[in-house]
């Protein structure tokens, strides 16, 4: 099995696949959600001031529910006692997502902390001294890439845990002076509620067996998540921004 994953529109291999590698099938799973960070956002308060009233009120409520959450930045040493629980939290989210092209090795995060500490970060979120969530990220120049997250789903509703994770990722991106944050796929609607917009990424797949390769498109179509969500436009000047992928 050969896979080329997550190429943006400008780097599509459509012509190359048609003439050079015709066995490769082009497909999309879900768009990635990207938020451009404005130059006048020096804090989360600055970001909130750019929101329409109802989204600003909602954000304050989310932050209020998350006041009891404490986070600790990890390095390769203090992470070791939490390695197993972090992987379990990741698996909870991964299994719930349904469709995954990859499955992480249990040592994945430890390895990144050991060898990529300048560009990779991971923070564990505690509630009443119990680790209930984590988020990770990669700093790629001026782009802040939200990486894998995990959380105890039973805490999500009462603490708005997932929404708080998104806001903490945003706060961290502002702190490191990033120009955009890539929130990745899944949970498209709630990510749009913090201002992210959809951008398609293209993947390519081929199998060495011609028989299997012939049914790959049908399998992928069956496994593809349903694209049923409403694009939110939280900013005061949202009507001035037009993205062809946005839904009304």
Per-region residue spans from a language model:
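A conserved beta-strand-loop-helix scaffold within acyl/acetyltransferase catalytic domains
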Residues: 2-157, 213, 238-248
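Acyl-donor binding region in acyl/amide transferases
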Residues: 1-25, 143-206
């Amino acid at each position: 099995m050969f896979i080329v994953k997550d190429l943006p529109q400008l780097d599509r291999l459509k012509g190359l696949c048609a003439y050079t590698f015709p066995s490769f099938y082009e497909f999309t799973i879900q768009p990635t959600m990207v938020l451009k960070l404005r130059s006048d956002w020096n804090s989360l308060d600055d970001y909130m001031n750019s929101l329409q009233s109802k989204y600003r009120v909602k954000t304050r409520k989310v932050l209020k529910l998350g006041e009891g959450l404490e986070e600790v930045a990890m390095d390769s040493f203090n992470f070791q006692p939490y390695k197993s629980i972090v992987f379990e939290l990741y698996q909870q989210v991964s299994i719930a997502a349904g469709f995954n092209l990859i499955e992480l090795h249990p040592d994945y995060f430890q390895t990144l902390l050991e060898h990529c500490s300048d560009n990779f970060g991971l923070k564990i979120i505690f509630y009443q001294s119990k680790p209930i969530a984590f988020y990770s990220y990669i700093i790629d120049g001026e782009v802040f890439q939200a990486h894998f997250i995990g959380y105890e789903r039973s805490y999500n509703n009462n603490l708005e845990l997932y929404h708080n994770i998104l806001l903490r990722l945003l706060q961290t991106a502002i702190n490191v002076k990033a120009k955009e944050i890539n929130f990745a796929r899944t949970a498209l609607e709630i990510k749009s509620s913090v201002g992210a917009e959809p951008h398609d990424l293209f993947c390519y797949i081929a199998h060495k067996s011609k028989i299997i390769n012939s049914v790959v498109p049908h399998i992928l179509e069956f496994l593809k998540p349903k694209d049923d969500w409403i694009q939110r436009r939280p900013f005061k000047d949202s009507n001035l921004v037009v993205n062809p992928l946005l839904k009304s």
